[in-house]
Amino acid sequence: SLFFSIGLLAHAQSCTGLWITIDDATGYKKSIVELYKKEGVLYGKVVYIYKRGKDGPNSKCTECSGKLYNQPILGMLIAKQLKWNGSEWEGGTILDPDNGKTYTCSMWLNENNHDKLNVRGYIGPFYRTQEWIRTDKIPTD
């Protein structure tokens, strides 16, 4: 039905925007990633780094290889090529700037709270899922 497909479309678009990432080890806010769509494909770039991080806003990707080695993490495109499958964004990749590794990635909104996004990175059969928190602004410190 038309109503159903409009609902799916709204659902597919609703993970665009600003998301706070949380450090798994400390539980502290780490960065803000902006998720945006380009030609129906989802991408994410780092738009803010909290001061508590390694080198704060000046952090470089010292563990990255190739062109990304030692590049600033602020502004870095870390999520790429995710496509909507009807229930989640999948088939893309996500880079963890802390270890320089790129993982296969999927993302989906928490069905009980659309201000929480599940972000799962896979290497082979192993995976880790993080929860990102929606925000509507970038701090101005």
Kindly give the residue locations of the regions a language model identified.
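Bacterial N-terminal signal peptides
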Residues: S1-G7
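General beta-strand recognition
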Residues: I20, Y43, E90-G91, K116-N118, ...
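Short aromatic-glycine motifs in intrinsically disordered, low-complexity regions
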Residues: C64-Y69, K116-G124
